[in-house]
Each structure stands twice: as C-alpha cells, then as structure tokens.
Amino acid sequence: MVINLFYTLFGVPDSGIFELFIPGAEAGDCYKYELKIKGGLTYLKADPYGNAAQKRPETASVIADLRDFSWDDSEFLKKRESYQCGNAPVSVYEMYLGSFVTPDEGQDYANYREIAPKVIDYVKKMGYTHVELMGIAEHPFDGSWGYQVTGYYAPTSRYGTPQDFKY
C-alpha cells in the first residue's frame, strides 16, 4: 500500500544538515525525498544516506532499526591493540558477492547469511588475511557490480537486510 504523506525538512542552523521527525514512522516504512527545482520539475529520490533500501526494481529507502545487534568482537579488538602494521604479511581477497555463491533456484542472489560461512571457510583455506567486498553499498544496476552507488550506508538489498549483513 502506498500512502503519500508530505513533510517539510527543517534546516539545522549553521550545519548544512536538514532534519525531520515523523510521528508513527517505524522500521520497515519506505520513504523518498521530493525535490522541486527551478522550472517546476519535481523528482522523487531515495535517501543516499539511509541505512536500507527496497529490493530492486523498487527504489525507495527503508527505515531500518539497527539497534538489535550484539557485537561479539572483543577478542579481535584486544588483539588489534597490539598489532603493528608491517610485522606480518597481508593477503587481500577481493570479491563480488554476486559471483561467489550460486543462489538457490528461483533466487537472483544468495543471502548474506548463506554467503558468510562459505567466504570464511574459503579465505581461511586459501590463506588470505583480509577480505575486500566489492559492490556492497546499494546500487541500481546489477551489471555495474556496485560502482554506481545510490545508498552509501545501505548494504545492498540484493543479498538481504541490514540485519542479515551484520550476521
């Protein structure tokens, strides 16, 4: 169901930032910005700084509740305190998630939760020390491999939700 509600953003003085509070808005609700420019043209645009997006071909931003994640990296952070860059070799595996795992029949892509254990097993087996994920931010065109970013802080919805990404 599409409900068109229009609210005005308010500028935060001396910051270049605009803000808005919408009573009743909740996680899962979709939204876009309406931009009116000279000449009377109007554009509807997704939030480039949102945390989630609709799965393509839809293009709205989605309100995401990111508070329900329990970090489990204290051991890593403790080790990192004493790590000296340059004292150990680095081997980076650059990967595009869309070509790493074959999705189940009827799916365009595998889910982050399905991909994660397979990536970990592979990089450990091959001796890589780091992983660089290509095309992980939201982008409109599959063929771009993520080089046309439209959501800088939204992990692409092709592979699941922000909660799936944090798995």
Model-derived regions: residue spans:
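The feature marks proteins involved in alpha-glucan
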Residues: 12-94, 99-107, 114
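Amphipathic coiled-coil/heptad-repeat helices and related helical stalk/stem segments
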Residues: 115-116, 165
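Short amphipathic alpha-helices and their capping/turn segments at secondary-structure boundaries
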Residues: 79-83, 116-127
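Short secondary-structure boundary segments
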Residues: 1, 67-69, 75-76, 128-135
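Residue-level signal for pocket-adjacent positions within structured domains
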Residues: 4-5, 39, 44, 58, ...
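Beta-strand-rich binding/interaction modules
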Residues: 1-7, 31
